[in-house]
């Protein structure tokens, strides 16, 4: 701490010194105004005894007058007469002479550029480095891990909800850190490394902090991207320093977040023969082999891209254990909601079970954001507490985007959108395999949609049948089918529906083996690439041109079948379609309670006719 307090004074003194040197170098010291006079005038002043004192240099004379002339009391002139001293003596004028010495000025002129460069180097590599926590140029090889102790993490297993099945695995790590002797009596030791795998936002970092908080041990937290800097060898040096610090603080936990930034498969995407990231990874592998798990150092790491990690990093003896932290189920979402609800003021009869039901697929981070959004919605309407309607509005905002109530559609466009959305809603309510309809709206959203039909599942699904996929195609095609049925033509409003339907149909044929024509072969596989998520999913096609043609025909057949089913269903329910569209135009948003025809009912026609909607 003393060093930190002295740093401002050090920088202050350095700045003052530089200012002084600059003043000397560039002559910034102020001097009195000097009047240059001819040597003959100087001799006259000397004879008239108007000169008080003189300073004689090698080539010039500086003097001061007894009385100022023209506002100047100091004068200078060129030294001409070598016998000047005799005349000065006769006149009784005191004078002095010096031999001009330019040694100091010469030396300072030579050193000034060097001193300026040294000062610039100091500020760049020391002052800036301290602000960024680098410790200066000499400290670039030091670990940048943030160290927490028990009271710093402020997180325990009580703050981690929705992953009860994972807590059992993690409790073993806490038990080892608290009681190593109990495991050592049978020769057991904790796994060297534990890899937390899961989608973003599922709580991997929170779990690591909870382990440290439960075990009450130091917690070294660092991101995988913080190891590599612009200097070669810095990453490897930081890995060594991190493990050295951990050994000194044992028992402790090292947590490396975003391990894929550091442990990416070697040779993939490397354009140099000796890549800096590979050096850092090699040093990490060496440290994992070198430290003894009985020392009490536990290594935790987290990633959402395990497929790109180097196989050498995942072998036994390094990361021995992988723990999947997946999206929570309904029970898990309920537990997570209860944790975050303590941070807001909500109505006592708030139905948390209902909120958990309408939020399938949301992660812990999503649910935390949902609770905050609901509180914002309640504040916006000046409510005293947060209610279920606020959570419903927050879910719609997350799913469909922000309402654009200022957008004004033409009357004919609103009518097309109303029939389009009612077509989706009636198709979903007529097919038992589909999720029930919760709300239909023709209010434009920021996500780019002019309307939306919101369906909410009643439970989590882990398997999807062929019938469910085919029915989903019917719901997607029903919007365009309604437009064609009512107006005799179609619009561009179904572009997104057609794209999603085509993707489902293609996966049904090529990935799921559900095509009666092509059989149960998997024709396309997804491979992991090196570049980001947009290019991460690369399709590998293992089929001939003839098979490609058959795939295209099969996909087209599925879409035509779905469109025919949707058209037949809406023809049978034409009265409901017209009534629902009129109500939607009047109210803009309706629910099954306001329009009972949206309640689930299995009444799909047994037969249908294929219709060409492009004409």
Swiss-Prot record:
Q: Which UniProt keywords apply?
A: ATP-binding, Cell inner membrane, Cell membrane, Hydrolase, Membrane, Metal-binding, Metalloprotease, Nucleotide-binding, Protease, Transmembrane, Transmembrane helix, Zinc
The record's subcellular location field reads: Cell inner membrane
Q: Which residues form the active site?
A: 421
In short, the EC number is 3.4.24.-
Which residue ranges are assigned to the Cytoplasmic compartment in the record's topology? Answer: 1-8, 126-615
What residues does ATP bind to?
198-205
Listed under subunit, the entry gives: Homohexamer.
> By what name is this protein known?
ATP-dependent zinc metalloprotease FtsH
Q: From which source organism is this entry? A: Pseudomonas putida (strain ATCC 700007 / DSM 6899 / JCM 31910 / BCRC 17059 / LMG 24140 / F1)
Q: What is the lineage of its organism?
A: Bacteria, Pseudomonadati, Pseudomonadota, Gammaproteobacteria, Pseudomonadales
């Amino acid at each position: 701490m003393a060093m930190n307090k002295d740093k401002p004074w050090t920088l202050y003194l350095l700045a003052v010194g530089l200012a002084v040197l600059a003043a000397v170098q560039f002559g910034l010291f102020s001097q009195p105004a000097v009047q240059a006079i001819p040597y003959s005038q100087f001799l006259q002043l000397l004879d008239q005894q108007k000169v008080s004192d003189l300073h004689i240099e090698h080539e010039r004379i500086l003097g001061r007058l007894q009385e100022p002339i023209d506002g100047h009391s100091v004068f200078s002139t060129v030294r001409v007469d070598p016998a000047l001293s005799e005349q000065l003596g006769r006149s009784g004028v005191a004078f002095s002479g010096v031999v001009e010495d330019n040694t100091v000025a010469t030396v300072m002129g030579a050193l000034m550029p060097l001193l300026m460069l040294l000062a610039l180097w100091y500020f760049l590599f020391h002052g800036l480095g301290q602000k960024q926590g680098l410790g200066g140029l000499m400290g670039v090889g030091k670990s940048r891990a943030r160290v927490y102790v028990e009271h710093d993490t402020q997180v325990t297993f009580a703050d981690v909800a929705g992953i009860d099945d994972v807590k059992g695995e993690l409790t073993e790590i806490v038990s080892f850190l608290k009681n190593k002797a109990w495991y050592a009596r049978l020769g057991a030791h904790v796994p060297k490394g534990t890899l937390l795998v899961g989608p973003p936002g599922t709580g991997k970092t929170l779990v690591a902090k909870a382990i440290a908080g439960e075990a009450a041990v130091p917690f070294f937290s660092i991101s995988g991207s913080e190891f590599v800097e612009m200097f070669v060898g810095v990453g490897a040096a930081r890995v060594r320093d991190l493990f050295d610090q951990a050994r000194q603080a044992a028992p402790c936990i090292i947590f490396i977040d975003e391990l894929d930034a550091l442990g990416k498969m070697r040779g993939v995407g490397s354009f140099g023969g000796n890549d800096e990231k590979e050096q850092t990874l090699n040093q990490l592998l060496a440290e994992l082999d070198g430290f003894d798990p009985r020392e009490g150092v536990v290594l935790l790491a987290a990633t959402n891209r395990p497929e790109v990690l180097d196989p050498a990093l995942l072998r036994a003896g390094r990361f021995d254990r992988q723990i999947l932290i997946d999206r929570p189920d309904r029970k898990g979402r309920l537990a997570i909601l209860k944790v975050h609800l303590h941070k807001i003021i909500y109505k006592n009869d708030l139905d948390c079970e209902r909120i958990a039901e309408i939020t399938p697929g949301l992660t812990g981070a999503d649910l935390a954001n949902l609770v905050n959004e609901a509180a914002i919605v309640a504040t916006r309407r000046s409510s005293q507490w947060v209610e279920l309607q606020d959570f419903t509005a927050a879910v719609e905002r997350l799913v469909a985007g922000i309402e654009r109530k200022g957008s004004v559609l033409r009357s004919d466009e609103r009518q097309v959108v109303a029939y389009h959305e009612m077509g989706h809603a009636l198709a979903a309510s007529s097919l038992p395999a589909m999720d029930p309809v919760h709300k239909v709206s023709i209010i434009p959203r920021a996500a780019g949609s002019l309307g939306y039909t919101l369906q909410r599942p009643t439970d989590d699904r882990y398997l999807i049948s062929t019938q469910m996929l085919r029915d989903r195609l019917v719901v997607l095609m029903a919007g365009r089918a309604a437009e064609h049925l009512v107006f005799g033509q179609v619009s561009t409003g179904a572009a997104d529906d057609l794209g999603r339907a085509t993707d489902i149909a293609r996966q049904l044929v090529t990935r799921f083996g559900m095509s009666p024509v092509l059989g149960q072969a998997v024709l396309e596989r997804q491979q992991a690439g090196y570049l980001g998520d947009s290019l991460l999913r690369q399709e590998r096609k293992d089929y001939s041109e003839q098979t490609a043609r058959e795939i295209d025909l099969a996909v087209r057949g599925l879409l035509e079948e779905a469109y025919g089913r949707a058209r037949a269903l809406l023809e049978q329910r034409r009265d409901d379609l017209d009534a629902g569209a009129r109500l939607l135009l009047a109210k803009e948003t309706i629910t099954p309670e306001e329009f009972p025809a949206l309640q689930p009912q299995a009444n799909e026609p047994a037969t249908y006719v294929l219709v060409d909607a492009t004409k």
